[in-house]
Structure formats: structure tokens, C-alpha cells
């Protein structure tokens, strides 16, 4: 984040000693700071340096996902196989490397500028639906979130019937323009492509609502139906106050307006 991390003088806009890391204005994640829209929001003094937190408990149907991926592979191009089909739906391979070619010195430094129709990374793939990178106006950086995932439950192959999933934690400064925007306007909107106008797309196959999408593989194009494999079983929207506010509360002092 700008103001928290040092900028690389040789690559303006990039973080020093972190190839591929783009600096984003702190106001996207920390209240009271300049945002990517070059606006400095007015917030109460005690809120400055705080953040808004999203916590979701996500139950994952691993067996259902695997069965669907195998069926999709057979339907589109049998020679592709389920592992390749799964990579196309997610946008990354099993080892985490993206399907998109890197534009910088590290694999995770990539965009979709050379893939407007989604022939390499399908426009309906999970990582493209939730972060279209070089496509959309204004910049996708105005809808970013800072997030982490905490898995729970045993590995699927060890205990297939056990409950498993992910505790999703994110930080932002506007639920409507960041977290909920990603869900509503990108992941769940079957018409949003994150690519060229008219590019084949669909709903997000991983976290989206039930729907479908278009995937090309093995020289064939398939229209796939997606059901829900990830369900929210608990959620919290919370305010994370700044340390300064916590100190005032601990001392029994009033918060400044």
C-alpha cells in the first residue's frame, strides 16, 4: 500500500523488492486515507486508520466439484481431462500457477491484456471473474479487497464425509463498492466478462450463484452448467477500530468526533 510500503524507483507504482506487487492507495483498505479514485473520504477522527472486515465461513462440496469437473471435461473435450478442466474453471493450475502468461519477472505478475476473448484464461474462470485486472473501467483497483483464507476440516481423500471448507477474511473501506461489488457485479453477473465486448463468459463456477459459462478446451467450446459447490454457513460484517481508538476506550476516555 502507498504510504506503508516503499516504491521501486526503477518501476514507479510497484513495491520495492516485491516483483509484481502493485502499490494501491491505502484508502482502499484503511479508513480516512486517499483511495484509488483520488478521493480522501471524510471520516470521524476516531475511525481514521481503522478498517471494515468481512468474515465468512464457507462450506465446500469437494466431491461434488470433482464430479462436475470430470463431467465437464468429458462433455467438452475428453482428451482435456479433469485436471485441465479444473484449471480452466479456476484460472490456475493445481500448484497455484496462473494460466495467464506473466508480464513481469514473477509468475503472479500477469494480466489479461493479450487474452481479450479468454482463450487462455476463460472469462468465466474464478480468478478472472473476481479480479479482471487489465479490463473494466474504472480500474479494477477501485474494487479491490485484502483477503486471506483459513482452511478447516481434514483433506478430502482422508475423510470424504467430513465437513470442510474455508474461513474467508477480508478488509476494505466500502462493502458496497468492494466486497459486495465483486460478488454482485462480477462473480454473479453472467454478462460480465472481464474481457473484450462479446467475449464468452458466465457466472463464477467456484463462488457464484447457480448458472453456467462458456469454456474452450481442446479446440472445442462447451456451454457448462454450474451449481453451487461453496455455500456460506456463517458471516460477519465488522468494524476494526484503529489502535488509537482502542487505547482511548481502554483508558475510559471519550472518542474524538
What are these language model-derived features?
Residues 1-257:
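Long, histidine/aromatic-enriched segments associated with O2/redox biology
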Amino acid at each position: 500500500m502507498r504510504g506503508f510500503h516503499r516504491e521501486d524507483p526503477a518501476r514507479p507504482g510497484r513495491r520495492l523488492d516485491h516483483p509484481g506487487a502493485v502499490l494501491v492507495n491505502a484508502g482502499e483498505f484503511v479508513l480516512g486515507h486517499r483511495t484509488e479514485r483520488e478521493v480522501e473520504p471524510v471520516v470521524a477522527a476516531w475511525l481514521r486508520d481503522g478498517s471494515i472486515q468481512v468474515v465468512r465461513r464457507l462450506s465446500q462440496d469437494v466431491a461434488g466439484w470433482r464430479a462436475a469437473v470430470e463431467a465437464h471435461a468429458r462433455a467438452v473435450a475428453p482428451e482435456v481431462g479433469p485436471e485441465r478442466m479444473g484449471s480452466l474453471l479456476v484460472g490456475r493450475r493445481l500448484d497455484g500457477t496462473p494460466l495467464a502468461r506473466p508480464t513481469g519477472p514473477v509468475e503472479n505478475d500477469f494480466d489479461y491484456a493479450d487474452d481479450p476473448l479468454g482463450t487462455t484464461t476463460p472469462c468465466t474462470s474464478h480468478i478472472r471473474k473476481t479480479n479482471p485486472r487489465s479490463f473494466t473501467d474504472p480500474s479494477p483497483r477501485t474494487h479491490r479487497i485484502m483477503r486471506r483464507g483459513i482452511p478447516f476440516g481434514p483433506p478430502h481423500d482422508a475423510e470424504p464425509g467430513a465437513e470442510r471448507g474455508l474461513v474467508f477474511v477480508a478488509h476494505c473501506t466500502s462493502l458496497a463498492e468492494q466486497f459486495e461489488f465483486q460478488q454482485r457485479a462480477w462473480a454473479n453477473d453472467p454478462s460480465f466478462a472481464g474481457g473484450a465486448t462479446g467475449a464468452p463468459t458466465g457466472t463464477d463456477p467456484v463462488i457464484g450463484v447457480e448458472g453456467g459459462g462458456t469454456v474452450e478446451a481442446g479446440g472445442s467450446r462447451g456451454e457448462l452448467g454450474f451449481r453451487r459447490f461453496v455455500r456460506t454457513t456463517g458471516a460477519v460484517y465488522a468494524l476494526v477500530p484503529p489502535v488509537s481508538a482502542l487505547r482511548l476506550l481502554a483508558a475510559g476516555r471519550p472518542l474524538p468526533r
